Amino acid sequence: MTAPVRPVPTVRVYRFELVKLFATWRIRLLVLACWLAPAVFVAAVSRQSSLPVDTLFGRWMNATGWAGPLVMLGFAGTYALPLLTSVVAGDVFAAEDRLGTWRHLLVAVRSAPRIFAAKALASLTVLLLLVAGMAVSSTAGGLLAAGNRALAGFDGHLLTPGDAAAKVLLAWVSVLAPTLALAAIGLLGSVLGGRSPTGLLLPAVVALAMALAQLLPLPVAVRLALPSYAFVAWNGLFTDPVQLGPLLIGVGVGLAWALAATALAYLLFVRRDFTNAAHDGSRRRTLVVLPLVALFAATAGIIAAATPALGSGIGQDKVQQSVATAFAHLYRLQAGQLHRPDVTEAQLAATAACTKGDGLVEAEGPGNDWRCVVSWHLPGVAATGSAVYQLDVTSDGRYVADGDGPKEVNGYFQVRTPDGDQPNPLWQFDANVELLPTTKG
């Protein structure tokens, strides 16, 4: 009797697909770029006098090496990761259509599900290698250029180098969820598109659309239901207390999209008629989008029901609390740099009174017309200190506070520190408003 023909083990097919991916010049070039370019970029920028202050943690790049990988993370979430998922995952199935090698592959492997699993795992492996390269390289460049020093958090409190290292690692790990979502969308586009470049374009187009949506004043539930939200929610790791709620929701939504899009791609792939040489993707491409639309609607509904957040999530009380907290932390940092007596946040008892549009409009929502007056007390001093800030609040809750006097407190001047001259930390600072309701302790 003839022994039954068994499919090739998935591990062998996975190794074969991995070799095929690394055989292409573009993957080799991407690996080289991701492991070298971030270190060069971060090291070069950290030594400049003009820093990327419009980027989160950019103003701290020459003060600590832990700011560099966070600046790179912000760039990666906006530009690099969508493009990498397009190149790696968006073409893994379509390449076989262009080369006309599906029949040969099926004869060799004898299992469409194993081919799908191997290709998906090979793409995932390459993506993880690229993300790890950017994280390790940017961290190395930052530490070599600026040193292993304390990092000012997103609310101004100082993190020890050890705490900063742990949170930088967690931040990079957290963005794997939206990266997997984009990769799964790339797999789906590659299966759907056949010979067309749909798979290559789809992750980048979806990421661009979601990035544009994040700029709009969306309701909180809709914003958190976007699979790309974890690309910006990681900044909550650098506040005290940590803003875990939005980050966990963002990671969960990203993983849900990754599973849904991968399942759709798998079902379409295993049901494909490979005997039809004229087949060029699914004929029901529009209908395939419906499950993802339903997932988005269901996620937004669940978040809206589970959280009492209304509107944009940016309100007067939240802005005032955030500004007062950040000011108190940074005041202590400034006092230490100027060799003044240390005071605690409790002793300062900083408060903020904020208005929007000179008080002519309701104090809620994003905008660059926020104005805050911060007041504080020093032990043994009868007079109450005050300082004015102009705020530019974006739709995702992040804001830049620009000091508007008195110049002795929040004006621009250089402070001489053991690590070199640094701008007055109270002059300009970045912070954020947590969009979900918070419990005051």
What are these regions (language model features)?
Residues 40-50, 196-229:
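Transmembrane helix segments
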Residues 60, 303-376, 424-441:
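Extracytoplasmic low-complexity, Pro/Thr/Ser/Ala/Gly-rich segments
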Residues 2-4, 35-87, 117-187, 191, ...:
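Secretory targeting signals
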Residues 366-441:
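Extracytosolic low-complexity repeat regions of secreted or lipid-anchored proteins
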Residues 86-104:
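Transmembrane helix boundary and interhelical loop/hinge segments in multi-pass membrane proteins
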Residues 279-309:
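Internal/C-terminal transmembrane anchor helices
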Residues 1-36, 273:
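Aromatic- and glycine-rich beta-strand/loop motifs that create alpha-glucan
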Residues 261-289:
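Cytosolic-side transmembrane helix boundary signature
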